[in-house]
């Protein structure tokens, strides 16, 4: 029986690979000579014979006490001085180790950004699937509808049209809009404030670029865009800290003898510490673990504790030397309901906390009273759109340029007709709709910490339900297998029964780190869409087997030119 030895090659190239050593001695000499040459090394000083005779790799076997498995490492043994110098460079040089670490960190971030773009692209593909299903539904056979569709049925279908991740079926427009912001914030590799990301996401939706959103925003055609409502400096400055499992232990609070104290340090909780205007927030996890910390606007908020994960309750808290003084449900991220708040009250009673003198409503001086604003009209219906100085680098058109071709006019006409169905069943409050302040956590003045009010930042919800049809090329999607109607209805039905706007509640997977939302968002879609998008982003092992198929993200092999290459493919080969 022939034994093969698996070695990981050390390379300065972009991709490391596992290889099985079965080459001839001549090939091994060439490999060693190339590996030991490097930049600045004189190849003539090291002959293949010296390496073959003086440089070898021998395995050392480490046995665990329970003898369940073996762990083998490879120890280099050499006598040649030049080989020793090369190994010392690899194993001991601080500059090389720092460069290697930097390379690994960048590659890790690049993978996270690609996965975030996959979450955006699969969402756009879901729009296309719904379009296809709606066309088939009009022919009755797809959904097996025997009776003529009623106005109520059309109303239900129009709402289903917007059944996206983070967007529910309720008429609470503010909650849906906030859910979109939280979705963007959660999947962003940098976890930039979703309130700020929404402006750039809106610009991306309405521009002509075919690049995926986060690539477009950071290094693509949109990297020069400086939105007047949210400058680049503010976008990068306000990034939300998502705690990992170890980090959040410092914020875990336990209750002993009716007093709140930090579990790790044993220090009694006192919210009077810190600045006079400091605001303290809490979340109660689904496993009934309480976390409390000081809120930092644009950096640390309710979603920080559990990395945007699911909670039982969230809100504001006031504690004086371990004694609970006030608590109320207020979180722009989780939007706690009365049921959530009562769950927290039950938790406190179970831990023998005296609630007799505890305030359950904010004081007016706390600035928590909800402000009322009138909903601004849809920007789609405005005759004069907001001016945007961004011009697409590839096409030369502004995102707000009116469509000048038949296909774009058809898309807009179809989208407007869908929105017009919303008037078929009038609401009681159509004459005047008042909503709470649309800031992430609580209303503030425009000058306070650089945040704007709802009236200044409001973008109509319809602007975000606009499908970016130019993201995909119709003529290269013939090879794609259609999504089964059972899977389409299964996902729609699964979202119909969810009343919460928490992203974690609308997804079936659970997570504990900042990478979790990106993975969970992908898993929420039918497997056909998942594999299709991952293959296009070169994040699926199936991509190599389907390399012969044309893909909007796959590179087109050309000589002497980069035409036809997708953004992700160019980045993969150039970086």
From Swiss-Prot:
An annotated GO cellular component: nucleus
TM regions (residue ranges): none
Tissue localization of expression: Expressed in roots, rosette leaves, stems, flowers and siliques, and at lower levels in cauline leaves.
Region (Disordered): 359-380, 421-452, 538-575
IQ domain location: 97-124
Keyword annotations of the record: Cytoplasm, Nucleus
Major site of localization recorded for this protein: cytoplasm
Function comment: May be involved in biotic and abiotic stress responses.
Protein name: IQ domain-containing protein IQM6
Organism: Arabidopsis thaliana (Mouse-ear cress)
